Amino acid sequence: MRYLTIALSKGRLTDMSVELFEAIGIDCTELKNSSRKLILTDEKNKIKFFLAKPSDVPTYVEYGAADIGIVGKDTLMEEGRHLYEVLNLGFAACKMVVAGPAELMGKLDRLTNKRVATKYPRIAREYFEHKRKESIEVIKLNGSVELAPLVGLSEVIVDLVESGRTLKENGLVVLDTIADISARLVVNRVSMKMKSERINPIIDAIRKELEKR
């Protein structure tokens, strides 16, 4: 039997992904041990795991280096890869929003400098230029995006919000919600056809596990 390869996102999704796979009977012992190995295995079920930067997971899955992946919907929207998004796993839930000073509430069509700061340039551009039909300048940031409106770099930001506390502490509010975000199970298109006898039982087992929660 050939191995199935699963790519997991490093960081906040790792523990929740491991818990889910263990709940359906997949051995994740090697994943839980702090090992320097890059590829970890469940020999009994013939499954290989590797941890990757979240933004790289869709790439590994699209090109078939991984058959299955777990990644946030925000990453899928930003990366725009060709793969199957088969399950909403429900965990790591948050929202992708447009945020800015409270005085801009209801006035997104009247921005003066038309600059939007974000870690998600594709999502920001899609929202403003396609949904709102507005021409904007997107400024890509890698750090604390909330800082941008405070120092005059941009009028608004596009970012993930969980509790909204960070926005509130910085005098910002949610101006619009772009999408509900959570972890998703994704599958390579060729693997879905060629390895369906291995992949479909995993999808079904995860679906049943989620229904119990």
Curated annotation (Swiss-Prot):
GO cellular component assignments: cytoplasm
A Pfam entry, by short name: HisG
GO biological process annotation, one example: L-histidine biosynthetic process
Catalytic reaction list: 1-(5-phospho-beta-D-ribosyl)-ATP + diphosphate = 5-phospho-alpha-D-ribose 1-diphosphate + ATP
Molecular function GO labels: ATP binding; ATP phosphoribosyltransferase activity
UniProt xrefs under SUPFAM superfamilies: Periplasmic binding protein-like II
Gene3D superfamilies: Periplasmic binding protein-like II
PROSITE patterns assigned: ATP_P_PHORIBOSYLTR
Signal sequence range: none
Alphabetically ordered keywords of this record: Amino-acid biosynthesis, ATP-binding, Cytoplasm, Glycosyltransferase, Histidine biosynthesis, Nucleotide-binding, Transferase
EC number: 2.4.2.17
Pathway listed: Amino-acid biosynthesis; L-histidine biosynthesis; L-histidine from 5-phospho-alpha-D-ribose 1-diphosphate: step 1/9
Subcellular location: Cytoplasm
Domain comment, as recorded: Lacks the C-terminal regulatory region which is replaced by HisZ.
Task of the protein: Catalyzes the condensation of ATP and 5-phosphoribose 1-diphosphate to form N'-(5'-phosphoribosyl)-ATP (PR-ATP). Has a crucial role in the pathway because the rate of histidine biosynthesis seems to be controlled primarily by regulation of HisG enzymatic activity.
Matches recorded under PANTHER family: ATP PHOSPHORIBOSYLTRANSFERASE, ATP PHOSPHORIBOSYLTRANSFERASE ATP-PRTASE
Subunit structure: Heteromultimer composed of HisG and HisZ subunits.
Assigned protein family: Belongs to the ATP phosphoribosyltransferase family. Short subfamily.
Name of the protein described by the UniProt record: ATP phosphoribosyltransferase
Source organism (scientific name): Acetivibrio thermocellus (strain ATCC 27405 / DSM 1237 / JCM 9322 / NBRC 103400 / NCIMB 10682 / NRRL B-4536 / VPI 7372) (Clostridium thermocellum)
